[in-house]
């Protein structure tokens, strides 16, 4: 046939792309390349596209053909090219005369289904090619393409060069240049070398729902990052992909990112207005967050002091009038005293004119008028099924305080008690039945007691003096870095006084709350490459393993650790939430396979499959993993000599543990240690370890006020209908629960207590928008189960309201860890 071929090439073949290739390996995507052959004499090979089922080559080859020539294009996986099946992924065979007239000339675009070979391996997907008789334009320089003989293709497959699937465009420094108040190193991605993959830099910050991830992909188009299939992006915008292949958009004008493509009629003012509206919603939600200790509203933005009693500032509450029981329960105040003092009591006045009372019976003094009535709040269920009961009892009839105890008032006239024996304070009167009685769920008793113990420790006491931090709102990250890193840890433990440049206002709590709210939005912004959004959704965070793109990244992680510690120390909340494994790492707990769900849901599923099935002869693995940074791919041994140790049924448990440890901990160990070094300067490790990982999330982020109506409105049902008795009982129970119980239910079912800024309608799962779902599943004697990656609750058909509440409470309150399945 070769003698009938023309002397010069007469057909240009462009191998454009393949789509939907078969994934043979449980744990890895293939590294596809294509081999084009005519008559066994002319062979051309494309470049290798790493880790994708949808490779895009767009590479051209000129061939000598006649109408009877058969063009065969085979696709192989480079990883398996030396194995028996050569990593075969499919083939197409095209008779040239059937698709194009070589005499008349022409240009034909073909999309053909991939076919099996003789060994009958499973194949699916399509191949897109172009045939053209126009050879007048030279083939562009294909630096990555290989033109080799058939012998070279079959014997030197290991030499196929590794190709970065995408390149990072240079960014004009003027597009996102900050003022570097903290250091001379820019925080922004324009310093990234031009070879950096966009998947290793940033992820979305806010905006609309995420498109479903398609897995790691190679470059699918030769479009620049400033345009896409719909045309050029507005000025200052850039298109990128995260590490899961999800497309997002970077607005260099405002240093923000979003999942939503900017419209062609993009208006910066409209976008700014929308961002400000969202910020206000988030601010209100953030300021309403609280902890069990602060139920009385001590964390309200309107108060001028933190809930920690400040005895030296206490004063006598206003006399006269009375309040309702509900009001008194909310404030902890007492009614005004009238009539004569009880026997043995005397009223005196300090040199400053402040009245106090002497109890000659016990030889003690107090600021509290013994004639006043105190409303005592006790937890537990009353006869009507309520959550609290109110008792009214004269203080004078309670008898003396236990030895070493003292009663005091806050500056808002709320009674609290000092235990000088343990140097702790509490709102609970030690003479009364404890509000932490046996009727309270175990988790609530433990969390409140832990909080009281934690905040009473000497290391958590505010030191004398003030710590002044002055920042500009529009430069809060850099200014905060400079201010907080220049001060010693002991200075940061003084009373925090925040000052916003150009604004009047004294910090009695409101400014510091605003400071931590704004700073948490900025420093956790994936735009800076320090953190990225998890595989679970687009609002929980994890450390970016490629943060080294910023040479100063370890200093910034230490700074962020200080900020988190500073917020806990001064009883403020951050508007940021991390994956469950991050909290476990903070507590120095060992991570488990369940924690992998929030990091890499596909890998979690594959590792779980490996543990549950026989892998002999099915999966070929070694104790090593492939890692890719900035286009450079390396093999990392999970144990000494791991790349030469095969994984078997006997050692697969160890393999899963080592992969989990590497994926979650080892990849970011350097950054995490820097974070913890800053955190532990303010919060000692032995103190924070009293909490579990779910409690630590609440300690850092607070407890949200959850709108049950909005939650119910955006819930789907499988096997149930909204009118079913079980569903009606479920929502009745949720409505009776307090904010802490609701937050724990949210943690149990979604993996985090965070609610999207626009409510439950924007709830995200591992594969994009995912509404909260209740599925009819399980035996009525079993506990409910959750699937946090899919925001799903498996709820058995319990017969009665009481059984449902009991089972749900046990599942929510006693389950440890984030991975419920």
From Swiss-Prot:
Record keywords: Cytoplasm, Repeat, Transferase, Ubl conjugation pathway
Limits of the HECT domain: 488-821
Biased composition (Low complexity): 311-339
Residues annotated as domain C2: 1-112
Matches recorded under Pfam families: C2, HECT, WW
Catalysis: reaction(s): S-ubiquitinyl-[E2 ubiquitin-conjugating enzyme]-L-cysteine + [acceptor protein]-L-lysine = [E2 ubiquitin-conjugating enzyme]-L-cysteine + N(6)-ubiquitinyl-[acceptor protein]-L-lysine
Residue numbers spanned by region Disordered: 140-240, 255-359
Biased composition (Basic and acidic residues): 281-296
Keyword Nucleotide-binding: no
Active-site residues (renumbered): 789
InterPro entries: C2_dom (IPR000008), C2_domain_sf (IPR035892), E3_ub_ligase_SMURF1 (IPR024928), E3_ubiq-protein_ligase (IPR050409), HECT_dom (IPR000569), Hect_E3_ubiquitin_ligase (IPR035983), WW_dom (IPR001202), WW_dom_sf (IPR036020)
An example Gene Ontology biological process: regulation of ubiquinone biosynthetic process
Recorded metabolic or biological pathway in which this protein acts: Protein modification; protein ubiquitination
Homology family: Belongs to the RSP5/NEDD4 family.
Subunit structure: Interacts with creD.
Function per UniProt: E3 ubiquitin-protein ligase which accepts ubiquitin from an E2 ubiquitin-conjugating enzyme in the form of a thioester and then directly transfers the ubiquitin to targeted substrates. Probably involved in the regulatory network controlling carbon source utilization.
Annotated protein name in UniProt: Probable E3 ubiquitin-protein ligase hulA
């Amino acid at each position: 046939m070769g003698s009938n071929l023309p002397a010069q090439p007469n057909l240009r073949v462009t191998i454009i792309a393949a789509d939907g290739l078969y994934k043979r390996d449980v744990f890895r995507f293939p590294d596809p390349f294509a081999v084009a052959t005519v008559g066994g004499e002319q062979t051309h090979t494309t470049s290798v596209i790493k880790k994708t089922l949808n490779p895009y080559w767009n590479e051209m080859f000129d061939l000598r053909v006649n109408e009877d020539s058969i063009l065969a294009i085979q696709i192989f996986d480079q990883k398996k090219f030396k194995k028996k099946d050569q990593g075969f992924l499919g083939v197409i065979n095209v008779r040239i005369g059937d698709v194009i007239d070589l005499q008349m000339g022409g240009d034909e675009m073909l999309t053909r289904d991939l076919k099996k070979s003789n060994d009958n391996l499973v194949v699916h997907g399509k191949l897109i090619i172009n045939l053209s008789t126009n050879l007048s334009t030279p083939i562009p320089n294909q630096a990555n393409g290989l033109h080799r003989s058939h012998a070279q293709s079959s014997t030197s497959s290991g030499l196929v060069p590794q190709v970065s699937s995408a390149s990072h465009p240079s960014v004009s420094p003027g597009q996102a240049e900050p003022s570097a108040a903290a250091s001379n190193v820019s925080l922004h991605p324009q310093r990234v070398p031009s070879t950096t993959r966009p998947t290793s830099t940033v992820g979305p910050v806010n905006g609309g729902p995420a498109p479903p991830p398609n897995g790691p992909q190679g470059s699918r188009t030769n479009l620049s990052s400033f345009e896409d299939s719909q045309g050029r992006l507005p000025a200052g915008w850039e298109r990128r992909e995260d590490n899961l292949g999800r497309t997002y958009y970077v607005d260099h004008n405002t240093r923000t990112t979003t999942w939503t493509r900017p419209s062609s009629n993009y208006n910066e003012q409209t976008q700014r207005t929308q961002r400000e509206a969202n910020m206000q919603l988030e601010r209100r939600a953030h300021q309403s967050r609280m902890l069990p200790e602060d139920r009385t509203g001590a964390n309200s933005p309107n108060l001028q002091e933190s809930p920690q009693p400040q005895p030296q500032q206490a004063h006598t509450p206003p006399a006269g009038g009375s309040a309702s029981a509900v009001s008194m329960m909310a404030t902890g105040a007492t009614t005004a005293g009238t009539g004569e003092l009880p026997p043995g009591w005397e009223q005196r006045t300090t040199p400053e004119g402040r009245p106090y009372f002497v109890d000659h019976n016990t030889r003690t003094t107090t600021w509290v008028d013994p004639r006043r009535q105190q409303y005592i709040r006790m937890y537990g269920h009353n006869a009507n099924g309520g959550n609290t009961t109110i008792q009214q009892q004269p203080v004078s009839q309670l008898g003396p305080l236990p030895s070493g105890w003292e009663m005091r008032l806050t500056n808002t006239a709320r009674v609290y008690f000092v235990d000088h024996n343990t140097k702790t304070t509490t709102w609970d009167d030690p003479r009364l039945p404890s509000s932490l009685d046996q009727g309270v769920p175990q988790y609530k008793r433990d969390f409140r007691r832990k909080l009281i113990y934690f905040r009473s420790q000497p290391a958590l006491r505010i030191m004398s003096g003030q710590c002044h931090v002055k920042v500009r709102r529009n430069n809060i990250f850099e200014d905060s870095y400079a201010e907080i890193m220049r001060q010693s840890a002991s200075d940061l433990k003084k009373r925090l006084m925040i000052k916003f440049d150009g604004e009047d206002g004294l910090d009695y709590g409101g400014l510091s709350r605003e400071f931590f709210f704004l700073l948490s939005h900025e420093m956790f912004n994936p735009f800076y490459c320090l953190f990225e959004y998890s595989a679970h959704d687009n609002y929980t965070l994890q450390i970016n393993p490629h943060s080294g793109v910023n040479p100063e990244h370890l200093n910034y992680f230490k700074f962020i650790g200080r900020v988190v510690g500073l917020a806990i120390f001064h009883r403020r909340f951050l508007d940021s939430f991390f994956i469950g494994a991050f909290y476990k790492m903070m507590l120095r707990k060992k991570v488990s396979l369940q924690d992998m769900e929030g990091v890499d849901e596909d890998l979690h599923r594959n590792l779980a499959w490996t543990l549950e099935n026989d892998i002999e002869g099915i999966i070929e693995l070694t104790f090593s993993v492939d890692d890719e940074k900035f286009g450079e791919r390396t093999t990392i041994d999970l144990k000494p000599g791991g790349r030469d140790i095969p994984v078997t049924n006997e050692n697969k448990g160890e393999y899963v543990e080592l992969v989990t440890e590497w994926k979650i901990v080892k990849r970011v160990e350097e950054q995490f240690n820097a974070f913890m070094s800053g955190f532990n300067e303010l919060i000692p490790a032995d103190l924070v370890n009293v909490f579990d990982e779910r409690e630590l999330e609440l300690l850092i982020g607070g407890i949200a006020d959850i709108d049950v109506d909005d939650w119910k409105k955006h819930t789907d049902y499988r096997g149930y209908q909204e009118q079913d008795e079980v569903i009606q009982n479920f929502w009745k129970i949720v409505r009776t629960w307090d904010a802490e119980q609701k937050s724990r239910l949210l943690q149990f079912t979604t993996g985090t207590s965070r609610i999207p800024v626009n409510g439950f309608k924007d709830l995200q799962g591992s594969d994009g928008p995912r509404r909260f779902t209740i599925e009819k599943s399980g035996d009525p004697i079993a506990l409910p189960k959750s699937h946090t990656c899919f925001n799903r609750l498996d709820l058995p058909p319990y017969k009665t309201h009481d059984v449902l509440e009991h089972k749900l409470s046990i599942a929510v309150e006693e389950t440890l860890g984030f991975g419920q399945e």
